[in-house]
Amino acid sequence: MILKNLAIVIAWALPQMAGATVYNVTPADNLSATINKLKAGDELYLADGQYDLTTTLKINCSGDADHLITIAAAEGAKPIIDFRGEANGTNGITVGGQYLYIAGLTIRYAGKKGIWLEKAKYCTLERLDVYGCCDSGIQLRSGGHNTVVNCDSHENFDYQNNGGNADGFADKQGDACPGNVYIGCRAWGNSDDGWDSFQRETDGTPTVYINCITYNNGPATFDMSAHPRVLGVDAGLFADKSLSSIENGGNPNGFKLGGKGTVHNTELYRCLAIGHRSKGFDQNNNAGAMKIINCTAYANNINYGFGNDYAYTLDIHNCISLDAVDSDIKTHKSGTIIQSHNTWLSGFSTSDADFESLDIEGLLLAPRNVDGTLAETLLLHLKSGAENLIDKGMVYDKSNFEGDVIAGYVGYKGSAPDLGCYETDGTASAIIGITDDVRLINPNQPCYDLNGRRVDASYRGIVIQNGRKFFAK
């Protein structure tokens, strides 16, 4: 299977429940009141425009396994949920329900977290753009079995706390909660970390990252001279300060995977970490099992940092480390390190000359495609002459991963995988578009629903098999 860009687009294909209602709202309508009416199978679509809110938008309704509740942009619309008038310390959107599909929204300038899933389960967030908030852009705590697809969280800064909390994505599940899945997401320019999975004890279900990107989180300073909250409701916090250079005390890490010596099993596949003043991939005191396959770290201080004194396991293969400031990788003697086919090992090497482009700003943050997938660029793609990296990886299949949801994405082109997060044909990771021809489903291979759970032949709805989506009626 050749790996391509990821897309899970389900709002228009889900079967509507008998008796379900479709709601359409505009910025002039009471969005909160409409959400409070939603029941299993209902659909709510937001028209274009800016929805100005000064209090938390609470989503506590629940669908069920066969009838999601949809809250999404109307087809072709780009609704903006704007919280610039909200008091500092107040969350933007909170989600406490189950079986929700929330898609196509811009969420910005919240007084605390942009969108916070608290005890939410079996929810899907897709094509969200979250920025300018006073804490983490997207946070998940407790609950589990949630999927976050093709979302961006960037330039969030908890200036009221000197920058120590605002991550792009904060996966802080608590004790013994099932893992969540992140696919095709980007985090950049946040005051703390790109992803922070602090203090989660696994129940055996790993947190999974597929084709995700993190860049330049924890910058030393922020230019806040044009931020609407700084010029408005929070102006009093900035008296006599130079708005063009506000110091940041956050942690400049990319993927931060653990916390407080707890066991947090984690799998990363075809992920990319660039330009962090600390670590690109960070153990962060994780005492669990961490698996990193076909990832790339570029221009971080430490590209792969796993030097904490815990009895952890690091399983790392087919990875590229390029232009680390301090070191390619750090590990600790207390850990069990299983590694092969990485550029820092004997017999492997890499240099800038192996890559088509290193134009980070011009390519990494390119606008997404209309369906939310990442634009294909040449950034950190291997040149055809990079024979030291092409087809030189460890051969693997889906059995190498614990997370069921990865099964539909694993693959490579050629006799063996290339090293790094991109195959040489310029592709990255994939679900192919939906087909209604269920005759193509192989009855001898497993199928999964959109939350990564294995389903049998009686299941009705969208199923995934070998990276292809089918609509089983």
Each language-model region and where it sits:
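Feature marks extracellular polysaccharide-active and adherence modules
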Residues: 47, 60, 72-74, 82, ...
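C-terminal outer-membrane/trafficking sorting elements
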Residues: 430-473
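Right-handed parallel beta-helix/beta-spiral solenoid domain characteristic of secreted/periplasmic
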Residues: 24-28, 48-54, 61-112, 157, ...
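The right-handed parallel beta-helix/beta-solenoid scaffold, focusing on the short coil/turn
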Residues: 21, 42, 49, 55, ...
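Acidic Gly/Asp/Thr-rich repetitive segments characteristic of extracellular carbohydrate-active
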Residues: 20-58, 418, 449-455
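Extracellular beta-strand/beta-solenoid scaffold signature
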Residues: 54-60, 83-93, 109-116, 132-141, ...
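Predominantly extracellular beta-rich ligand-binding scaffolds that present long acidic/polar faces
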Residues: 264-381
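C-terminal accessory segments
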Residues: 347-428
